[in-house]
Amino acid sequence: MKLTDLPDSRGHFGPYGGIFVSETLMAALDALRVEYDAACRDPGFMAEFEYELKHYVGRPSPVYHARRLSEEYGGAQIYLKREDLNHTGAHKINNTIGQALLARRMGKKRVIAETGAGQHGVASATVAARYGMECVVYMGAEDVARQAPNVFRMKLLGATVVPVSSGSKTLKDALNEAMRDWVTNVESTFYILGTAAGPHPYPMLVRDFQCVIGRECIAQMPELVGRQPDAVVACVGGGSNAIGIFHPYIPHENVRLIGVEAGGSGVASGKHAAPLTAGTPGVLHGFRSYLMQDENGQIIETHSVSAGLDYPGVGPEHSYLKDAGRAEYVPINDDEALAAFHDLCRFEGIIPALESSHAVAQAKKLAPTMKKDQVILVNLSGRGDKDINTVAKAAGITL
């Protein structure tokens, strides 16, 4: 079976993925899979999805040659896929529009979501307003504090934001609560999962909705440089922006795919969120993948300066691509990401999300090892307005 043909009918990417949930959710997931299969074969559904991406989101997003950044770093030419220019400021909206159209197709009037950085919460609240649905967003209490502007945005858009105070009070705990809500209200509620993780069919359908990123790049790069890039770099938390740009490139064997995890305070410190670098396979949130866990299988608390990467698992397709050797995964620590954030601000006039700054930081390491006529394509997954407070605090500045 080719890498691009996965998952199999049971949602497996080799040993990863699958469905590990309570009986209550099995029927809901099966109904979702059946509805999604039908939607994919329905030209009307796909046409509406594409219409919304063009006229509501503002796609295609441009690919931009970061000339001054390339000069500063030396070596390869750096190009940025500008997902930060989408409506709501990140790649998340590609997926929430697709899932909201599915929810409407299934007759669901209430949607729920989990969020870390708040971008998926904002994108979910946005599409709920767009299609006239009730929206509840679960968010770790620590992230509510870190991402106050996005919390207010969600409320402006009509969503109810529920702070989650259990565990580490971050994305993992928000996801737990969202799944509890779904079990309780499965008849009326559609769960808009924010990343390419969770039980089947979510990793597949989120990837499919995000693949617009990579498909656009494959069309755009020859116009800009006459060929495809030598390397594609994207940050990986759950991994939806990365799989969205990686997946269409999988058959292009001479294109390196590099996923960048949150190295936090350094992998050796144990305070990080890099399961592909330092984790082991296990089951969490309904799927099997590389996880941050101890020898007893208990989830270890994660750390990252970036709320959106602060997750102890990763999408199952990334785990499979790692094992298959088709993609490579590297950690970038907080300080490196913050430095890259400032670089992009100063040299290109672009304020990136801290998540995306991890990918820029990897380009900073990679570019000098390559020739001047080689090309790195960085997925700039979101803009950094939401992170201004965090960046100021890291610099000892009070806003």
Swiss-Prot record:
EC identifiers of the protein: 4.2.1.20
CC annotations in GO: cytoplasm
Annotated pathway: Amino-acid biosynthesis; L-tryptophan biosynthesis; L-tryptophan from chorismate: step 5/5
Names of required cofactors: pyridoxal 5'-phosphate
Record keywords: Amino-acid biosynthesis, Aromatic amino acid biosynthesis, Lyase, Pyridoxal phosphate, Tryptophan biosynthesis
Pfam families, per database record: PALP
Residues recorded with modification N6-(pyridoxal phosphate)lysine: K92
Enzyme class: lyase
Domain of life according to the entry: Bacteria
Any one GO molecular-function label of the UniProt entry: tryptophan synthase activity
Extent of the signal sequence: none
Family annotation (PANTHER family): TRYPTOPHAN SYNTHASE, TRYPTOPHAN SYNTHASE-RELATED
Function: The beta subunit is responsible for the synthesis of L-tryptophan from indole and L-serine.
HAMAP family per record: Trp_synth_beta (MF_00133)
Family: Belongs to the TrpB family.
Subunit structure, as described in the record: Tetramer of two alpha and two beta chains.
Descriptive protein name: Tryptophan synthase beta chain
